[in-house]
Amino acid sequence: MHTEIAHQSEQIHRWQRGPSTFWVHPEKGARLMRWDIEMADGSVREILHWPDQADWSQAGKIRGGNPILFPFSARSFFKGELGYWKSPQGKRPMPNHGYARQGAFQLENAAADGFIARFLPDTEAQANYPFDYNFFVDYRFHDLALEVTLTLENTGTEQIPWSAGHHFYFNLPWHADLERSHYEIHLPKCKGFRQDTRGNLLEDKTVQQVENFGNDAINDRIHTKLKRPDAKFGPAGGEEWIQLSWEDSHGPAAWHALTTWTDQHDSLFYCVEPWMGPPNAAETEKGLHWVAPNTSQSYRVRVELG
């Protein structure tokens, strides 16, 4: 069931699918805000964290839900200078995580199982990512899962670079009597990297296929060169897993990335973030994708409760 409601002084949309409720602000960042699930005993479990107070005038700074990262994920650099990217035309500004998460969208379609929204780049975004394109966010909601597809449609005459991603703020720990150290993430065989202060990728050779969320070493670590396009996490012991999988419309990509990040030791969330590639993709060309004129590319992510 799809309804519109007032929430935190904003008019938002809500989808109910079986035991799941999805709270969304399609016009502001195409932002999935919350995902709740009603348990068998009538209690409600928060899957995606959303703060009790949110300043929508600073949407890019709200720590919750799933910010859309476009055209590039995380920090961009130009010859070591933060906040710029290596465009085909040379040095241009690029904020952390791009423009979409704080940008305006137009709701193109709302159906019983989800919606499609189109990015409306402002003057700054048009100047600094100067291409002719349509960027769509398509969410499909299910009883115990969601699928989100990012599509870049090139309507111009030159190829367009991109390396988009997601910033899921998962509620963790989600049991009142457990701590972070009781949860673990299972990764496919992969390599770990960190980004230095000039935008270079430095290999972290401590990465393991099973990592504990209580281990500070996984915070702000980029996992890439993944042997499979999937991962899962949950309480040690194998119950109540959250599973993620991803794919490109244009085939497997060696530099797909999964980043793990949180803010503080006592933050109510831990972010598990599927990206099309590592940060600073435009300069390193690792995980950089190109869309030819009059074609489109899509990146689909599925999150499922196990």
Predicted regions and their residues:
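Extended, loop-rich substrate-binding clefts of extracytoplasmic carbohydrate-active enzymes
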Residues: 1-7, 88-143
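Beta-strand-rich N-terminal accessory domains
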Residues: 1-69, 74-75, 81-84, 226-251, ...
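Acidic, contiguous internal or C-terminal segments within carbohydrate-active enzymes
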Residues: 15, 26, 39, 121-168, ...
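A short, structured loop/turn motif at beta-sheet edges
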Residues: 39-42, 108-115, 140-145, 174-179, ...
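Acidic/His-leaning functional-site neighborhoods
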Residues: 94-109, 212-286
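Beta-strand-rich interaction surfaces with strong enrichment in secreted/lumenal proteins
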Residues: 136-138, 286-291
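C-terminal or internal capping secondary-structure element at the end of a domain, subdomain, or sheet
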Residues: 145, 156, 289, 295-306
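Active-site/ligand-binding surface loops and adjacent short beta/alpha elements
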Residues: 159-161, 169-249
